[in-house]
Regions:
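N-terminal secretory/targeting leader peptides
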Residues: 1-76, 85-86, 94-279
């Protein structure tokens, strides 16, 4: 996982330069699933996490907006907004739960992968699609006429293999790294979410750092995010053809999936029009 490598790079840089702290990393779900992590960072049980902001929607409903389907026009649009003025807007909200956004990074563009060919909206009817534990993602799959199954990603390979779910949606880098191509052989290039993830830090822990260590931590995270974004953008340029070499069928769908999704989702995204002005 590139995200794990990103955070280990940040940790190494912090530990090489900080004066009053030492950071230990726990990758690959060792500290629990998404719900455990987002609760843990609020309560101070975990100091720093990477997560999709939609995972905080139970406490900050507006946090889910930045993962809305078809919201971002490009990766550059997302980066400009979330590392610019919209970051300040979000940080004000996250202060309410004692969490600080340290930075946003490009997780990848989410695509649909299934156990049968999907090239149009009608093909999705009745299918069981795994999603993250997020109302926004559940609503998106409802717009497709499919059934959403929230599930921890570490349980997903087996669920795909046994047919508990018919498909899932994630960036191709995730599809590859978790080897989901071994159990589902169809990728539909829906490009439905240009997906940000964020590095979050417990507010009390941040406030307890010296000025020197604050600068070290923020610089290390910024450097790691720059590396991560470059890695994902480069990998995505060749991944479709690499997956074809592994026996995966790559499908370009018609416009019916997008046309069903945007009108269903957009009314619930308060800042949709404002975010478009940040491109």
């Amino acid at each position: 996982q590139v995200v794990t490598q990103m955070m280990m790079k940040a940790i190494d840089e912090i530990n090489a330069n900080a004066e009053g702290i030492h950071v230990t990393g726990y990758p690959n779900g060792v500290l629990g699933g998404s719900s455990d992590l987002v609760e843990g960072v609020q309560e101070g049980m975990v100091d720093i996490i990477t997560e999709g902001p939609a995972q905080f929607a139970s406490w900050i409903p507006k946090a889910a907006q930045v993962e809305a389907p078809y919201l971002w026009q490009s990766v550059e649009h997302m980066q400009k907004a979330l590392n610019g003025e919209y970051k300040d807007t979000l940080n004000e909200l996250f202060q309410q739960v004692d969490v600080r956004i340290m930075g946003s990074f490009y997780y990848g563009t989410r695509q649909l992968t299934t156990n049968k060919t999907v090239s149009t909206l009608a093909d999705l009817k009745g299918m069981k699609i795994r999603v993250p534990q997020s109302d926004l993602y559940i609503k998106m799959v409802e717009a497709w006429g499919a059934s959403a199954t929230p599930m921890n990603i570490n349980e997903l390979y087996m669920a795909l293999q046994t047919g508990t779910v018919d498909g899932q949606e994630n960036p191709l880098t995730t599809f590859q790294s978790y080897k989901f191509y071994e159990v589902v052989k169809n990728v539909t290039l829906t490009n439905h979410i240009i997906c940000p993830n964020m590095v979050f830090m417990n507010g009390d822990v941040w406030n307890g750092l010296s000025d020197h260590d604050k600068e070290v931590v923020q610089t290390a995270i910024n450097n790691a995010i720059t590396w991560q974004d470059e890695q994902i953008i480069t990998a995505e340029q060749s991944l479709a053809s690499e997956l074809e070499g592994l026996g995966v069928t790559i499908i370009t769908p018609d416009d019916t999936i997008r046309e069903a999704t945007v009108p269903y989702i957009k009314p619930s995204i308060e800042d949709w029009d404002y975010i478009q002005t940040l491109a």
